[in-house]
């Protein structure tokens, strides 16, 4: 029995599949927020059967209560929504990283992409890095097509633990012979919760790449407010300010060991502040 259920028509114009799911490479919840923002104007076209792909003891459903009364159970999901673009249409895969059946998910998604005539696959994610919130969010771009990779991207071999988004984008690209591009934001180690400046940067890059009109006013407002809260929290803490300024100035020239040490110092210092209202880890 297929684990991917079709929920609506998929008659689309030269669609691009964007994979933006929570999990291993979702630092600052950037992929989660990007996916939510993109699919807000979309329609559901497919979804994986939750009972087949999730272990509910580790990916638990949430129970919503209002004024003490239970109102709804929210189950983990992995779904695909469609939205109209100015040129190509867009399919957006969002949800939780499943606990099982990754290869079968990849195989069925590759078949779905073939049926929908997907022309490109775009993976979205974020990783904690030696960057400061005072900087523009750096983006790492990966691609199976050198023509789609900007000049200046480091070359060479790199082996890292794979997230489901890596598995899916690679196998769909490989099975169908279509290009795959990845946009990976680098977010500050020391910030907890959703990192809205990173969300804004990725949505800007993604909308330009897709030729998609995206209303970013709300996201820009969140990003501006978050930077202001971070600056205010540091205003009377010169030691933390100095550390973050040093991180911003030297991030590109620090050795991995020195950068890790500096980041550890910043994280420790900010955690020790003991202020529950600050947006620090």
Which residue ranges define each predicted feature?
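N-terminal short beta-loop-beta anion/metal-coordinating cradle
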Residues: 1-95
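Short coil/turn connectors at secondary-structure junctions
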Residues: 12-16, 87-90, 116-119, 134-136, ...
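Flexible, glycine/proline-enriched loop segments at strand-loop-helix junctions
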Residues: 21-25, 93-102, 151-159, 189-193
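Hydrophobic/aromatic beta-strand patches that form the interior of the parallel beta-sheet core
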Residues: 46, 91-93, 122, 179-184
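Short, ordered loop/turn segments at secondary-structure junctions
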Residues: 50, 126-127, 188
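Internal, conserved structured core segments that host functional sites
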Residues: 88, 96-147
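Catalytic cores of processing enzymes, dominated by hydrolases/peptidases
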Residues: 130-213
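A conserved C-terminal secondary-structure "cap"
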Residues: 191-281
């Amino acid at each position: 029995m297929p684990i991917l259920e079709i929920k609506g028509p998929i008659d689309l114009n030269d669609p691009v599949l964007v994979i933006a799911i929570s999990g291993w490479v979702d630092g600052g919840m950037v992929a989660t927020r990007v996916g939510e923002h993109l699919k807000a104007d979309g329609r559901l076209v497919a979804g994986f059967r939750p009972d087949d792909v999730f272990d509910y003891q580790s990916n638990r459903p949430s129970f919503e209560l209002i004024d003490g009364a239970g109102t709804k159970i929210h189950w983990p999901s992995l779904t695909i929504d469609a939205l109209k673009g100015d040129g190509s249409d867009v399919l957006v895969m969002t949800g939780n990283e499943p606990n099982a059946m990754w290869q079968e998910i990849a195989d069925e998604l590759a078949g779905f992409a073939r049926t929908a005539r997907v022309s490109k696959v775009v993976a979205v994610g974020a990783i904690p890095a030696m960057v400061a919130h005072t900087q523009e969010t750096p983006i790492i771009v990966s691609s199976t097509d050198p023509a789609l990779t900007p000049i200046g991207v480091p070359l060479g071999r790199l082996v890292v633990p794979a997230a489901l988004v890596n598995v899916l984008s690679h196998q769909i690209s490989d099975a169908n012979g279509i290009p795959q591009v990845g946009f990976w934001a680098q977010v500050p180690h020391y910030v907890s919760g959703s990192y809205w400046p990173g969300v804004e940067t990725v949505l800007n890059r993604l909308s330009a790449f897709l030729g998609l009109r995206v209303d970013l006013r709300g996201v820009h407002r969140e990003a501006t407010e978050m930077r202001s809260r971070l600056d205010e929290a540091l205003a009377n803490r010169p030691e933390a300010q100095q550390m973050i300024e040093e991180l911003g100035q030297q991030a590109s020239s620090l050795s991995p060991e020195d950068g890790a040490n500096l980041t550890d110092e910043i994280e420790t210092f900010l955690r020790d502040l003991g202020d529950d209202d600050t947006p620090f880890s």
